[in-house]
Structures are given as C-alpha cells and as structure tokens.
Curated annotation (Swiss-Prot):
PANTHER family: FORMATE ACETYLTRANSFERASE, FORMATE ACETYLTRANSFERASE 1
Record key words, sorted: Organic radical
PROSITE patterns per the UniProt record, alphabetical: GLY_RADICAL_1 (PS00850), GLY_RADICAL_2 (PS51149)
InterPro entries from the UniProt entry: Auton_GlycylRad_Cofactor, Form_AcTrfase_GR_CS, Gly_radical, Glycyl_radical_cofactor_GrcA
GO molecular function: formate C-acetyltransferase activity
Protein name: Autonomous glycyl radical cofactor
Higher taxonomy: Bacteria, Pseudomonadati, Pseudomonadota, Gammaproteobacteria, Enterobacterales
UniProt GO cellular component terms: cytosol
Length: 127
C-alpha cells in the first residue's frame, strides 16, 4: 500500500517537512519534495531515512493511461450497397453516421471525394 507522508521530525535536517510516498510492501520511499539531499522522484529504502516522525497526507490517486504502441480500429457495421445508395440518394439517409479516423460524422456531410474514399477503405475483398 502507498501512503503519502510529511516528515515532521528527523535527525537529518534535510528531511524536515519533506514529502514522501511510502510503499510498505516494498519497504521503499519515493521523494516528492525535500529541501536538499534527495532528488525529486528518488527512491530509497525506508531505513535510509533514519529515525523519523511523520504525519499522513491524504492522497488522490488518478488512473494513469499508458499507451505503448497500439492499434486503432474503426468499425462501421453496414453493407457497401448502403453507402453507395447513400451517395446516389442522400435524402434517404439523413441520419447515417459512420466512424472516420476516430470521430463520428454524418456520411452525407462528407464531400463526394471523401465518400468515395470511405467506401474504398471500408470494404475490401480480402485482408
């Protein structure tokens, strides 16, 4: 479990009023802010801090999103004939919405060139 602390008493004056994250499972402390002697984000064994007294600091943990490469997939569930008919008869499909490069757009609001491009990219004969 991670606990946020502010050191209120320490033999080492550089630690006084410093802020740390204590990882009780690993027996480590990560420096958040200190006057001197410790760098921001430096991780040390808790026993390296020596004899200390501290008060717990409430923490708000926000989920972290990590993106490591990855893929992007747009899925449009319809038939090629539907889009081709929408090109010829847009009045029949005023609400036809498709995904294009990560956003939703009404098919009829695209230019004719964009519509042809969507049809060409969306439907393939094989992978």
């Amino acid at each position: 479990m991670i606990t946020g602390i502010q050191i209120t008493k320490a033999a080492n004056d550089d630690l006084l009023n410093s802020f740390w994250l204590l990882d009780s499972e690993k027996g480590e402390a990560r420096c958040i802010a200190a006057k001197a002697g410790f760098a921001e984000d430096e991780v040390v064994a808790v026993n390296k801090l020596g004899e200390i007294e501290y008060r717990e600091i409430p923490m708000e943990v926000k989920p972290e999103v990590r993106v490591e490469g990855g893929q992007h997939l747009n899925v449009n569930v319809l038939r090629r004939e539907t889009l081709e008919d929408a090109v010829k008869h847009p009045e029949k499909y005023p609400q036809l919405t498709i995904r294009v490069s990560g956003y939703a757009v009404r098919f009829n609001s695209l230019t004719p060139e964009q519509q042809r491009d969507v049809i060409a990219r969306t439907f393939t004969e094989s992978l």
